[in-house]
Amino acid sequence: YQDYMAVGGDKALDNVVGFSKKVWSSWAPASWELFSKAVPKLNQLDDVGEVEEGTFSVEKVLSLKPDLLVLADWQYEMLGSDLDAINEAGIPIVVLDYNAQTLDKHIKSTEIIGELTSQKDRAAKIAKEYKDIVEHIQTTVKNSKISKTTKSSTWSLVVVAQLNKG
């Protein structure tokens, strides 16, 4: 959600009619509280349920009469035959993939959001900044004299680094 809003800017939600609200509000309550206060429209959008929890409602999506449906790659894969009704209704499906954690897929997903929200320039700027940061980190790590590999993980990020203990 934050990616979509970051690229789309102030008008990111102007054409949004529904989203998986509960997953954001229950899985990341502090983030939800901040965003829903700053962007009150979030509270007005319909909740279409969550794919991973099995609450995603194709009927709810169809009732909203969307021009298109935006899904993460993993959501698209999990929905399987549930997508048939959406396809039969003629609703195009746009698949984004930030979860693959690759530079190319992040940039492509950002560009797609820029296209969807009429924010191509903003998307290009964000993609370039992201690419520059990733390349800077890769160069810094490559050029460092680090000797030991350490792995640390959190719920949304895996960091692999080498620590110089000498």
Predicted regions and their residues:
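A short, structured surface patch at a secondary-structure boundary
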Residues: Y1-S63, L68, A72-Q75
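Short glycine-enriched loops at secondary-structure junctions
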Residues: W74-Y76, N99-A100
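Extracytoplasmic substrate-binding proteins
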Residues: S81-N164
